[in-house]
Design a protein with these regions (language model features):
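N-terminal alpha-helical targeting/anchoring segments
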Residues: 1-134, 149, 153
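TRNA-recognition modules of translation machinery and tRNA-sensing kinases, especially anticodon-binding
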Residues: 27, 130-428
Length: 428
């Protein structure tokens, strides 16, 4: 959410930003919110005038009574009552206008970074760099669930009977591998100075609307019936939410947290849920990282965050590349975003395994995350990035470490988390 003062003073900049994001249907909202904001400010001025006059008249009643000017005192009391009634109407109108302004501001997209490439959708994202040499094996690589089944490591049919599509049972060596990757990612981030955090897996509605757009909320979040609670789609939500309504000392910044959590997503939209496979599902686990920092430090932290993911994947012998997300692919709160994609030898192409985003002060403005510095109080900047998200990451791991005989190599970095195992051997 952008600053209403910025919008008021720079309507053309906001409109051009909307055009750059190919959201032209939102263009009329700029003039609409400016008009509502002007009405709100005039209403507030009227309320302030009424309040001041009412208080002045109220104070005069005592003096009039002391001077035995009873008729004047009674007349003044009536005038105070009339002004109080008018003030109540103004205050009611103020609440109504504030809600209208807030609702419109919530759907006007954040101002994107000037370095973001202009494009309509993810097909126009721009490759930044490749890391590692993509593998083209001499043998055919099976679909990822077929690999897992050879280890008796997955049961989608049982999961479908229990919960429907979009769920899975992982077992045996594949389940161990899943847990090993999460544990390794946790320690990897701790070694890089991040504080490990186990957050709530449910958050209140006010936190949800503070960390994401209405469109994202509708497509992702599961609501608990009868409660003001939602299952998290990512632990970023609850980690950023930790700082809601806080004024933090500038000297304590940055806050760098990493967390493990289950994630729950409706995956409502064009992609939907896979009938077979674990690439897009309703429930999965993820190691996440977030940063709360000073505005001038957020570009530096942005580059550090996505580099962490690249470095981790390279220690697991998985080639990756980074993509700069174009304007049309950025969610409304994001200033800048880079996707990390892993190489799929089976498909001979890259696929997304993580996303790093700089939200600027958008989440901080909604959640009122403020910083107290020498020059006063200001809004923090927030950033987030996927460290690793099994089981999607397992697809890349299994394909890139698979041998022709069906065994899977365990990279050196992961062996301590697999009891020293160097290779997984299929059971079937």
């Amino acid at each position: 959410m952008i600053d209403i003062k910025f919008l008021r003073e720079n309507p053309d900049v906001v409109k051009q930003n909307i055009k750059n994001k190919f959201q032209d249907s939102k263009l009329p909202l700029v003039d609409e919110v400016i008009a509502l904001d002007e009405e709100l400010r005039q209403n507030k001025k009227r309320a302030d005038d009424l309040r001041a006059n009412r208080n002045k008249l109220s104070k005069s009643i005592g003096a009039l009574m002391g001077q035995k000017k009873f008729e004047e005192a009674e007349a003044t009391k009536k005038l105070v009552a009339e002004q109080a009634a008018e003030l109540a109407k103004c205050e009611e109108k103020e609440t109504e206008l504030e809600e209208k302004v807030k609702n419109i501001m919530m759907v006007i997209p954040n101002i994107i970074d000037p370095t973001v490439p202009i494009g309509k959708d993810d097909s126009e994202n721009v490759e930044v760099q490749k890391y590692g040499e993509p593998v083209t094996p001499a043998f055919e690589i099976p679909y990822h669930t077929d690999i897992m089944e050879k280890f008796a490591g997955i049961d989608l049919d049982a999961a479908r009977r229990v919960a429907g599509n979009g769920f899975y049972y992982l077992m045996g060596d594949i389940a161990r591998l899943h847990s090993a990757v999460i544990s390794y990612a946790r320690d990897f981030m701790i070694d890089r100075g991040f504080t490990y955090c186990i957050p709530p897996y449910m958050i209140r509605g006010g936190v949800v609307t503070g960390v994401m757009s209405f469109a994202e909320m509708d497509a992702m979040m599961y609501k608990i019936e009868g409660e003001d609670l939602y299952l998290i789609g990512t632990s970023e939500h609850s980690m950023i939410g930790k700082f809601i309504d806080q004024i933090v000392p500038e000297g304590e910044l940055p806050y760098t947290l990493t967390s493990y959590s289950p994630c729950f997503r409706k995956e409502k939209g064009a992609h939907g849920i896979e009938e077979r496979g674990v690439y897009r599902i309703h429930q999965f686990e993820k190691q996440e990282m977030i940063v709360v920092c000073k505005p001038e430090d957020s570009p530096m932290w942005f580059n550090k965050l996505w580099q962490n993911t690249v470095d981790l994947f390279r220690t697991l012998d998985i080639p990756v590349r980074t993509l700069e997300c174009c304007s049309g692919d950025l969610a409304d709160l994001k200033v800048k975003s880079i996707d990390v994609e892993a190489w799929s030898p089976r498909q001979q192409k890259y696929f997304e395994v993580g996303s790093c985003s700089n939200l600027g002060d958008a989440q901080a403005r909604r959640l009122k995350i403020r910083v107290k510095g020498e020059g006063g109080t200001y809004l923090a900047h927030t950033l987030n990035n996927t460290v690793v998200a099994p089981p999607r990451m397992l697809i890349a791991f299994l394909e890139n470490n698979l041998n022709e005989d069906g065994s899977v190599n365990i990279p050196v970095a992961l062996r301590p988390y697999m009891g020293g195992t160097e290779k997984l051997v299929p059971k079937k």
